[in-house]
Regions:
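Predominantly flavin-linked oxidoreductase catalytic cores and closely associated redox partners
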Residues: 1-134
Length: 136
């Protein structure tokens, strides 16, 4: 930006842009470099829970027309997870008789034998979910 090693202005110096706004939203993704700097500079994590991560799976199903309701959105929480593990699902009925079916589980689960993929498979056995995707 036109500064030498000591921070003095060189011949090609041009000042940086000044940004003035009532609200500024930084959305660079999960744990981005700018976000880390802002959190540190403004102490944004003081007294806050740390960021949490999860693993998710998504499948696209073409289902029977009688089970399809274009535009329907469903979200669930919990089952088949135990009470100490958080997670949930989404089911989006898209066009063309398609359903986007997904499940997300927080990566802080305590059970070392828990398989997020297997939990997603088990989720699809719930009677309400099985009814939607049956024959798909």
């Amino acid at each position: 930006m036109g500064l030498d090693k000591e921070g003095n202005k060189k011949d090609g110096y041009e000042p940086g842009m000044e940004l003035h706004a009532k609200v500024t939203v930084f959305s660079e993704g999960c744990r981005g470099h700018l976000g880390k700097q802002l959190i540190k500079k403004f102490d944004l994590d003081n007294g806050k829970d740390p960021q949490q991560y999860g693993i998710g799976f998504k499948e696209i199903w073409k289902i029977d027309e009688k089970n399809h309701q274009e535009g329907l959105v469903m979200h669930t929480a919990g089952w088949p997870l135990d009470k100490n593990t958080y997670g949930g699902s989404f089911i989006y009925h898209a066009d063309n008789k398609q359903v986007f079916l997904g499940y997300v589980i927080g990566l802080d689960y305590k059970n070392p034998h828990l398989s997020p993929f297997d939990e997603f498979q088990r989720f699809k056995t719930h009677p309400a979910i099985r009814k939607i995707i049956e024959g798909g």
